[in-house]
């Protein structure tokens, strides 16, 4: 009853792919792309993330990542890094506003 990991688990950790910089595409709005929906909830068409051969919305992706690292639809690893196609809409602030209690 030790605190050490089993040999199989240690090998699995060592065999995991290193961070290669691959990021999943995020589609802000898929209304003009045809029948593209989240394959988990079949409702959302915004903030879709490419997961291998299908799309997941951000809500479903967050929920699925809290349960497992594998996609229940394609059984492949879920995307954990996203590639933004457009810059954020909020301008950067040069300095934070002064603190006032």
From Swiss-Prot:
Subcellular localization, as worded in the UniProt entry: Virion; Host cytoplasm, Host perinuclear region; Host cell membrane
Domain of life assignment: Viruses
Lipidation (N-myristoyl glycine): 2
Cellular component, GO, one term: membrane
Modifications after synthesis and translation: Myristoylation is required for the role of RING finger protein Z in assembly and budding.
Compositionally biased residues, Basic and acidic residues: 1-11
RING-type zinc finger segments: 38-74
PPXY motif (motif): residue ranges: 96-99
Pfam families xrefs: zf-P11
Gene Ontology MF term list: RNA binding; zinc ion binding
Compositional bias ranges of the Pro residues kind: 89-101
Presence of the UniProt keyword Isomerase in the record: no
Family: Belongs to the arenaviridae Z protein family.
Function, in words: Plays a crucial role in virion assembly and budding. Expressed late in the virus life cycle, it acts as an inhibitor of viral transcription and RNA synthesis by interacting with the viral polymerase L. Presumably recruits the NP encapsidated genome to cellular membranes at budding sites via direct interaction with NP. Plays critical roles in the final steps of viral release by interacting with host TSG101, a member of the vacuolar protein-sorting pathway and using other cellular host proteins involved in vesicle formation pathway.
Annotated protein name in UniProt: RING finger protein Z
Organism from which the protein derives: Ippy mammarenavirus (isolate Rat/Central African Republic/Dak An B 188 d/1970) (IPPYV)
């Amino acid at each position: 009853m030790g605190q050490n990991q089993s040999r199989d688990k240690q090998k699995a950790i060592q065999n995991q792919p290193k961070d290669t910089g691959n990021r999943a595409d995020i589609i802000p709005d898929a209304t003009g792309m045809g029948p593209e929906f989240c394959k988990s909830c079949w409702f959302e068409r915004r903030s879709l993330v490419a997961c291998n051969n299908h799309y997941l919305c951000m809500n479903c992706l967050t929920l699925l990542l809290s349960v497992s690292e594998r996609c229940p639809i394609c059984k492949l690893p879920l995307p954990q890094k996203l590639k933004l196609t457009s810059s954020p809409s909020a301008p950067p602030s040069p300095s934070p506003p002064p603190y006032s209690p």
